[in-house]
């Protein structure tokens, strides 16, 4: 489980953050100053990478949050088994299975190279190469 800790004020739209134990892509950040003596608060809205659920949190801008270390890799399709696909990583030659996203179901054939991401022990197929 690779992650690092940063302050909320360094987060940007399009980057990733861990909310409720899930890696999520930030879709919106808004900050507000509550008053004369209060510290600024940030509201961060994000969508889960692996489950597509909307999540959000409100924290002071100087508080710390975890961000995932996302590893983008290339793999080759070995076999297609119903709703799952068996892939082999082209660097480590490790084989694993992952669900097929709806938008890639027509493009996947055996032998084609694909890109996938790995974060917090989970993998997701992103797109075909070429």
Curated annotation (Swiss-Prot):
It holds the Pfam family IF5A-like_N. GO terms for cellular component: cytoplasm. It comes from the Archaea. The modification Hypusine is found at residue 36. The keyword ATP-binding does not apply. One of its GO terms (biological process) is positive regulation of translational elongation. It is found in: Cytoplasm. Keywords: Cytoplasm, Hypusine, Initiation factor, Protein biosynthesis. One of its GO terms (molecular function) is translation initiation factor activity. Coiled coil: none annotated. Functions by promoting the formation of the first peptide bond. Belongs to the eIF-5A family. This is Translation initiation factor 5A. The lineage of its organism: Archaea, Methanobacteriati, Methanobacteriota, Methanomada group, Methanobacteria. The gene is eif5a.
């Amino acid at each position: 489980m690779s992650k690092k800790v940063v302050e909320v004020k360094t987060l940007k739209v399009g980057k990733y953050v861990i909310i409720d134990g899930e890696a999520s892509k930030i879709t919106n950040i808004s900050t507000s100053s509550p008053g004369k003596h209060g510290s600024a608060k940030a509201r961060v809205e994000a969508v889960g990478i692996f489950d597509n659920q909307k999540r959000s949190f409100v924290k002071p801008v100087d508080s710390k949050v975890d961000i995932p270390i996302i590893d983008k890799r290339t793999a080759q399709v070995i076999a297609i088994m119903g709703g799952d696909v068996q892939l082999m990583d082209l660097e480590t030659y490790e084989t694993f299975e992952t669900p097929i996203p709806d938008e890639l179901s027509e493009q996947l054939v055996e032998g084609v190279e694909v890109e996938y991401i790995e974060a917090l022990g989970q993998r997701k197929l992103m797109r075909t190469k070429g």
